[in-house]
């Protein structure tokens, strides 16, 4: 008998233990702004990142931590971060790597809000994006690379076109040119696709959609695979390899990366937490974190039904004379059907376009 936790058990219990005083089983809502310290040494260790723990709810809170721990476990990552929205998750992920004068290579098949961020808003901050000509062709990604390229980005299953990205092939090109691959896995969820297993380095989600599932709360998740070593490229990623004067001269790649005292490469996710979330403030409330956690517990059951319904609707639409085309990778007629069967054998999501 296997002792490994199933998807469902992890989604319900990871990152939280019964309360030691009351023995309460459910995840508490830690509706607090601040925390006490055991002594001055404990406080100093937390603020210097010698020890990880709660300082202020803008950057960490036990209710938030339980949810990103569950999400990280389901994705197969090393650590995560819960923020105010999916849009905030993408923005922090991009700004955690790229700075003014830098460049991003992206799939053109994106959620409209993400396209606006890359095409209109980030250029105002000095960050430009090239949308590849053909996201299905790895060489199209390679051709878009510039000397100042800092990351690749795409959606595992795109909203709303429902095309499936060949994560494995795109990740191979990204790593050959020395940049990380960020994947938005909102449509697929970790129940259908685990992008880190196909070579992605970082995964983002709008937890508002399928993870929350009830339309009551807005949140976003970042999960770090810990696989990209920024120390290997000191000139390309100076923000990871030079001292951060706002954090006591901390060098993220050296002090928090591969070979650090934490036993995992946490340079990306801790930089996102203690630098960007600290300064930009896109924090999620503990109450919203609790509501999203309630949804996560039933994710697998809901996604199975969503996929079942989407297949039926797509198949019916395909038979209608008045419907010119149906975009759904779960249809055998889809150009992404074979890739969808490989990367997402449980189903290619519940979104379709016609």
Regions found by a protein language model. Name each.
Residues 1-54:
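N-terminal glycine-rich, Lys/His-bearing helix-loop that initiates the first secondary-structure elements
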Residues 322:
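Hard-cation-handling environments
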Residues 34, 39-91, 113-121:
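Conserved N-terminal alpha-helix of the aminotransferase class I/II PLP-enzyme fold
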Residues 26, 311, 327-353:
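Conserved glycine-rich beta-strand-loop-beta hairpin in the small C-terminal domain of fold type I
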Residues 37, 136-140, 334-335:
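A short acidic, often aromatic-flanked loop/helix-cap motif at beta-alpha or helix-coil junctions
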């Amino acid at each position: 008998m296997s002792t490994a936790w199933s998807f469902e058990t992890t989604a319900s219990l990871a990152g939280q233990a019964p309360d030691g005083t009351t023995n309460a089983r459910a995840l508490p809502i830690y509706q607090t702004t601040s925390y006490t310290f055991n002594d001055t040494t404990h406080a100093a260790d937390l603020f210097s990142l010698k020890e990880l723990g709660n300082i202020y709810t803008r950057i960490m809170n036990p209710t938030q931590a339980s949810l990103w721990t569950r999400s990280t476990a389901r994705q197969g990552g090393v650590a995560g971060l819960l923020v105010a929205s999916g849009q905030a998750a993408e923005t922090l992920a991009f700004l955690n790597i790229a700075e003014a004068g830098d460049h991003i290579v992206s799939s053109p098949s994106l959620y409209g809000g993400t396209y606006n961020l890359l095409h209109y808003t980030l250029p105002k901050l000095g960050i430009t994006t090239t949308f590849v000509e053909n996201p299905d062709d790895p060489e199209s990604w390679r051709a878009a690379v510039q000397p100042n390229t800092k990351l690749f980005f795409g959606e595992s299953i795109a909203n709303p076109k429902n095309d499936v990205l060949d994560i494995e092939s795109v990740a191979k090109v990204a790593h050959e040119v020395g940049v990380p691959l960020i994947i938005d896995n909102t449509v697929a969820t970790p129940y259908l696709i685990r992008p880190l297993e196909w070579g992605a380095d970082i995964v983002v989600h709008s937890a508002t959609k399928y993870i929350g599932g009830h339309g009551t709360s807005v949140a976003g998740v970042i999960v770090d695979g810990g696989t990209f070593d920024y120390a290997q490229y000191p000139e390309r990623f100076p923000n990871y390899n030079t001292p951060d004067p706002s954090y006591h001269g901390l060098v993220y790649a050296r002090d928090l990366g591969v070979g650090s005292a934490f036993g995992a490469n946490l340079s990306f996710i801790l930089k996102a937490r203690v630098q960007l979330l600290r300064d930009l403030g896109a924090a999620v409330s503990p109450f919203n974190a609790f509501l999203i956690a309630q949804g996560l517990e039933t994710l697998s059951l809901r996604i199975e039904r969503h996929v079942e319904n989407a297949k039926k609707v797509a198949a019916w639409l395909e038979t209608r004379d008045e419907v010119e085309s149906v975009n759904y990778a779960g249809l055998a007629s889809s150009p992404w059907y074979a890739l969808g069967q490989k990367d997402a054998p449980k189903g290619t999501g519940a979104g379709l376009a016609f």
